[in-house]
Curated annotation (Swiss-Prot):
Keyword Translocase: yes
Known catalytic reactions: 4 Fe(II)-[cytochrome c] + O2 + 8 H(+)(in) = 4 Fe(III)-[cytochrome c] + 2 H2O + 4 H(+)(out)
UniProt keyword terms in alphabetical order: Membrane, Mitochondrion, Mitochondrion inner membrane, Translocase, Transmembrane, Transmembrane helix
Chain ranges on the Mitochondrial intermembrane side, renumbered to this chain: 35-40, 106-128, 184-190, 257-261
Species name: Damaliscus lunatus
Name of protein: Cytochrome c oxidase subunit 3
Record field: transmembrane: 16-34, 41-66, 73-105, 129-152, 156-183, 191-223, 233-256
Entry's localization field: Mitochondrion inner membrane
EC number: 7.1.1.9
Length: 261
């Protein structure tokens, strides 16, 4: 589309939804191959395809919004509804994991020893690394709000500082989570406790990585003066997503780490 004479969202034909779906298939298949056959070839191919898709799709959206001016107020309204529905779908996604956890923990079967945590499982101390992780994510929630308010007030330097702090806290959280996984006294194959713990916290960790990537893109866009105090939906969507990640972690901490231990 070279010229647009209306306010509505008419997108160009794009291959990226198809390559994104293909990369998701390759990654999930690759994860199974890695778990069962210790082969990471398919997983690496999926990750590479996914990163290329992300780069090119983001590039196209930035070009359409910032340089071609296609993101009118009507288009932004549609994108807001889309992001809200996406976050609602993510809430339902995590609801499934919490359902699995509570289904197993509220009425433990004789195979689990009739208790929770199951016999033989030594849970992680919720007052050590998990509590630090909670503090880190809550602090990142404060800094992303600071960044948002700075952007709305036109304070570019404060916005960049706050956004950088948020990204650093997100990376720190990921490193802490990785070290916790490495030192955990149980694995994903240790029955229903191990599987619910690693799948729920692992998918949350994946969302933190996705959110951090989203914020890094926003950071470089802000360096190039892409956002104004009235036109910054890309950053707003990233902030909404980050707050969602924060809230999910609080539920995970209270349910799996604290109550579940």
């Amino acid at each position: 589309m070279t010229h647009q004479t209306h306010a509505y969202h008419m997108v160009n034909p794009s291959p990226w939804p198809l390559t994104g779906a293909l990369s998701a298939l390759l990654m999930t298949s690759g994860l199974i191959m890695w778990f069962h056959f210790n082969s990471m070839t398919l997983l690496m191919l999926g990750l590479t395809t996914n990163m290329l898709t992300m780069y090119q799709w983001w590039r196209d959206i930035i070009r359409e919004s910032t340089f071609q001016g296609h993101h009118t107020s009507a288009v932004q309204k549609g994108l807001r509804y889309g992001m809200i529905l996406f976050i609602i779908s993510e809430v339902l996604f995590f609801t499934g994991f919490f359902w699995a956890f509570y289904h197993s923990s509220l009425a433990p079967t004789p195979e689990l020893g009739g208790c929770w945590p199951p016999t033989g499982i030594h849970p992680l101390n919720p007052l050590e690394v998990p509590l630090l992780n909670t503090s880190v994510l809550l602090a990142s929630g404060v800094s992303i709000t600071w960044a948002h308010h700075s952007l709305m007030e036109g304070n570019r330097n404060h916005m960049l500082q706050a956004l950088f702090i948020t990204i650093a806290l997100g990376v720190y959280f990921t490193l802490l989570q990785a070290s916790e996984y490495y030192e955990a006294p149980f694995t994903i194959s240790d029955g229903v406790y191990g599987s619910t713990f690693f799948v729920a916290t692992g998918f949350h960790g994946l969302h933190v990585i996705i959110g951090s990537t989203f914020l890094i893109v926003c950071f470089f866009r802000q360096l190039k003066f892409h956002f104004t105090s009235t036109h910054h939906f890309g950053f707003e969507a990233a902030a909404w997503y980050w707050h969602f990640v924060d809230v999910v972690w609080l539920f995970l901490y209270v349910s799996i780490y604290w109550w579940g231990s």
